[in-house]
Amino acid sequence: MDTQTETLLQEIAEERRSHYFGKYRGIVLEALTGDDIGKLKVSVPDVLQDQPGIAVPCVPFAGPSHGLVAIPEKDDGVWIEFEAGDPSQPIWVGCWWGTGDMPSQAGPKIRTFVTTGGLALVMDDDKNELSLQHPDGPSITLSSDGIKLSTDAATVTLNTQGISLQGNTAVGE
């Protein structure tokens, strides 16, 4: 092998040893809220060993004063990539669930956004409905039939037939 080829192979090998491409499993150590851009302090043992990294977000929609904001919490699993493969520039690009951690409302035709506290936005294509659900029971459901407001004590339904009120209620008190 000539010297030029050998040098090139050494450079490629060194580049490979010092750069990390692809996704790596990380764990959120802390959500950093001071700069208002969604940075996370993360642990990525396969790359950073026992040193934490500060990861910037990669989100599907963002701009001045608008965008999709869903910041993972402490101990959540996050997928980490590194800008241009540089381990000093981590990017969190998504999250992963451990076994049994996925919200129970989800499925192939059910899109769900659930907070840690149990507040849920559920979009069910099979039922053709959208609902906001509170973990203590109240909900608002929109469907092609109308709108339903529900609590443990009462249900109000607004549809093409009018308004119905069911439950232990007093109107006009």
Which role does the model predict for each range below?
Residues 2-156:
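Hydrophobic packing positions characteristic
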Residues 156-165:
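Short linear motifs in low-complexity, proline-biased tails and propeptides
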Residues 168:
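Glycine-rich ThDP/TPP pyrophosphate-binding loop and its adjacent helix/strand module
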